[in-house]
């Protein structure tokens, strides 16, 4: 009697097909079962799937975790704790951005060849309001779990599931091969931290950067949270986090029709220069961005003074302001995962971000905190 071959769900990016025979040979060598529905799906998924593999000559700890980059000179004490969890699935009924399967946004590449500043129609503005409200709910769900002992991978699971519950696609998932559904940046990590198995510790700070896609629109927001009472009692961290929060608030207060995009950086750096108790610097490598039907588009919003960003705010435009400030100098390095950005000094960094809609008289903070949102300024 013939036996029926057991069916598995394909491990490929954005694929929910059944798979039976084809397995990743590297996973087989590591004793891991990962099935794919075909060679094309395996090839398309490789840039993310490879993060699940333990590099040769890397020893596992007793708990099965390991540092995938043992020869890299990390600037601070933070190191990645692998293996990463398997790629999380998105149900097929949820609408996807154009890069969900390939990792490459062709629509963003086309837009990038021209400097177009889109002004949304009233209907499109409602689409942005909806996705940003959902984004706030998702961020708050993750923030409620921030405590010593929670891993950043657990935060990723919370964000992913909260997105799915709201019929949203997590915008970071497979965006140019980013392997997770949220960015979690701890201590000296400036941005784009990949969630892994490291538990948060009392005294850490963690930035949770949520981006999601709903009914054709992206929303984007982040906040930095204190982990435990030890962090809240650290004067360096409090100075850094609270001044980053204030710098964003001051920039938002200046958003109105007719303001040059370059002006927001002047406001942010003027505030950081006024801080006398600590040296705090503005990161120049990363900037805010336009956002609408595209995840990233024009305009660019640098956060430092005397920048040359072109363009003027007009009613109907939507964009983010998301300053990253560091203790000490602002030079940054990138980990070998090609995503994680760390301060070169190993000192801590903080960030806050909102998505904004320019109105006739000022702006609307589409991702504004709710009365019961976790975190917030220290009293």
Swiss-Prot record:
Chain positions recorded as Zn(2+) 3 binding sites: 209, 220, 353
One GO location term (cellular component): nucleolus
Catalyzed reactions per annotation: Release of N-terminal amino acids, preferentially methionine, from peptides and arylamides
Keywords, ordered alphabetically: Aminopeptidase, Cytoplasm, Hydrolase, Metal-binding, Nucleus, Phosphoprotein, Protease, Zinc, Zinc-finger
InterPro entries: Creatinase/aminopeptidase-like (IPR036005), Pept_M24 (IPR000994), Pept_M24_MAP (IPR001714), Pept_M24A_MAP1 (IPR002467), Zfn-C6H2 (IPR031615)
Subcellular location: Cytoplasm; Nucleus, Nucleolus
Cofactor(s) needed for function: Zn(2+); Co(2+); Mn(2+); Fe(2+)
Major localization listed first in the record, in broad terms: cytoplasm
Entry binding sites for Zn(2+) 4: 220, 289, 322, 353
Chain positions recorded as Zn(2+) 2 binding sites: 24, 27, 49, 53
Top-tier EC class: hydrolase
Pfam families from the UniProt entry: Peptidase_M24, zf-C6H2
Keyword Isomerase: no
Keyword Magnesium: no
Positions where Phosphoserine occurs in the chain: 373
Enzyme Commission numbers on file: 3.4.11.18
Binding note for cofactor: Binds 2 divalent metal cations per subunit. Has a high-affinity and a low affinity metal-binding site. The true nature of the physiological cofactor is under debate. The enzyme is active with zinc, cobalt, manganese or divalent iron ions. Has high activity with zinc; zinc cofactor is transferred into the active site region by the zng1 zinc chaperone.
Biological-process GO terms, alphabetical: protein processing
GO molecular function annotation: initiator methionyl aminopeptidase activity; metalloaminopeptidase activity; zinc ion binding
Start and end residues, zinc fingers (C6H2-type): 7-60
List of residues binding a protein: 192, 296
Similarity annotation: Belongs to the peptidase M24A family. Methionine aminopeptidase type 1 subfamily.
HAMAP family tied to this protein: MetAP_1 (MF_01974)
Matching NCBIfam families: met_pdase_I
Assembly notes: Associates with the 60S ribosomal subunit of the 80S translational complex.
Protein name from the UniProt record: Methionine aminopeptidase 1
Source organism: Schizosaccharomyces pombe (strain 972 / ATCC 24843)
Gene: fma1
């Amino acid at each position: 009697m013939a036996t029926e071959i057991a069916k598995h769900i394909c491990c490929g990016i954005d694929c929910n097909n059944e798979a039976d025979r084809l397995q990743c040979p590297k996973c087989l060598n590591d004793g891991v079962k990962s099935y794919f529905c075909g060679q094309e799906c395996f090839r398309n998924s490789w840039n993310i799937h490879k993060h699940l593999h333990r590099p040769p000559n890397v020893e596992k700890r007793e708990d099965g975790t390991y540092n995938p980059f043992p020869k890299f000179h990390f600037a601070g004490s933070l190191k990645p704790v692998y293996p990463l969890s398997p790629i999380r699935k998105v149900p097929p009924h949820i609408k996807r951005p154009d890069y969900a399967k390939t990792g490459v946004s062709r629509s963003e590449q086309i837009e990038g060849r021209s400097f177009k500043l889109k002004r949304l129609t009233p209907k499109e503005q409602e689409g942005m309001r909806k996705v940003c409200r959902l984004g706030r709910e998702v961020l708050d769900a993750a923030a409620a779990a921030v405590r010593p002992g929670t891993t950043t991978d657990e935060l990723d699971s919370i964000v992913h599931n909260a997105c799915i519950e709201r019929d949203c696609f997590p915008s970071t998932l497979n965006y140019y091969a980013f392997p997770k559904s949220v960015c979690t940046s701890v201590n000296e990590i400036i941005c784009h931290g990949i969630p892994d198995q490291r538990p948060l510790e009392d005294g850490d700070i963690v930035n949770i950067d949520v981006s999601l896609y709903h009914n054709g629109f992206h929303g984007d927001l982040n906040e930095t949270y204190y982990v435990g009472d030890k962090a809240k009692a650290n004067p360096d961290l409090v100075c850094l986090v609270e001044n980053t929060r204030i710098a964003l608030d001051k920039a938002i207060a200046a958003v109105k029709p007719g303001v040059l995009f370059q002006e927001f950086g002047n406001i942010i750096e003027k505030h950081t220069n006024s801080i006398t108790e600590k040296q705090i610097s503005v990161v120049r490598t990363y900037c805010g961005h336009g956002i609408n039907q595209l995840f990233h588009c024009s305009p660019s919003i640098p956060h430092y003074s005397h920048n040359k960003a072109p363009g003027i705010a007009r009613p109907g435009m939507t964009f983010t302001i998301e300053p990253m400030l560091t203790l000490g100098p602002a030079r940054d390095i990138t980990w070998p995962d090609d995503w994680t950005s760390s301060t070169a000094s190993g000192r801590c960094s903080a960030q806050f971000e909102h998505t904004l809609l320019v109105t006739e008289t000022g702006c609307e903070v589409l991702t504004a905190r709710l009365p019961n949102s976790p975190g917030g300024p220290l009293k």
